[in-house]
A protein has these predicted regions:
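Flexible loop residues that form catalytic
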Residues: 34, 78, 140
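Charged helix-capping and loop-helix junction motifs
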Residues: 46, 89-95
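Redox-cofactor binding/interface segments in oxidoreductases and associated redox assembly factors
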Residues: 31, 75-76, 137
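Internal, well-ordered alpha-helical segments in soluble enzyme and binding-protein domains
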Residues: 9, 13, 93-94, 131
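Short, solvent-exposed loop/turn segments at secondary-structure junctions
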Residues: 36-37, 79-80, 115
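Short, basic, glycine/proline-bearing loop/turn elements
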Residues: 29-30, 78-83
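N-terminal active-site beta-alpha-beta segment that forms phosphate/nucleotide-binding
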Residues: 1-69
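Surface-exposed, charge/polar-rich loops and edge strands
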Residues: 64, 68-72, 82-83, 96-152
């Protein structure tokens, strides 16, 4: 994918995140700083900075005590399946972090649609892997209760 297309798709994904109830109702948001080929998070950070009721936290290797106050987590990943499973970069950082969160915390993965395996494929998870509540791509929102496809 060329850089221009990646930027366009990243913007679409982020605008979709900003339009969700989960984003609108979240006060404390943990969000990754995008690098390389990951979906950009610049629009999300900017949107949160415009709203005084939102506080942004960035992931750290040793999460602070405020982890219990997080309403929403935006996570990256390498590949996902439609059953809400996620493979990251293999270090287990996010799974350890997500496991500490209260059950009420919403976990949203943002990804390009090509990163999501079709329903015929399923990622093999281990006991430590944490499933997402929602996966948002440029084409659809995948939720535990079903998929919303965008009209092209």
């Amino acid at each position: 994918m060329c850089p221009e297309e990646a930027l366009e798709l990243s913007e679409k994904i982020q605008k979709t995140v900003c339009s969700t109830h989960e984003w609108g109702s979240a006060g404390n948001i943990n969000i990754y700083k995008s690098t390389g080929n990951e979906v950009s998070t610049k629009i999300l950070v900017h949107d949160a900075e415009l709203h005084s009721d939102k506080v942004i936290y960035y992931p750290t290797p040793e999460p602070k005590d405020n982890v219990m106050d997080v309403d929403l987590v935006i996570v990256p990943g390498v590949v996902f399946d439609e059953k809400m499973a996620r493979y990251g970069r293999g270090g287990g950082y996010y799974d350890r972090f997500l496991d500490q969160l209260p059950k009420r915390t919403c976990i949203i993965a943002i990804a390009y649609d090509y990163q999501v395996l079709s329903h015929r494929w399923k990622l093999k998870l281990n006991e430590f892997d944490i499933k997402m509540d929602m996966i948002i791509t440029e084409k659809r929102i995948i939720q535990k209760r079903g998929t919303l496809n965008y009209k092209e």
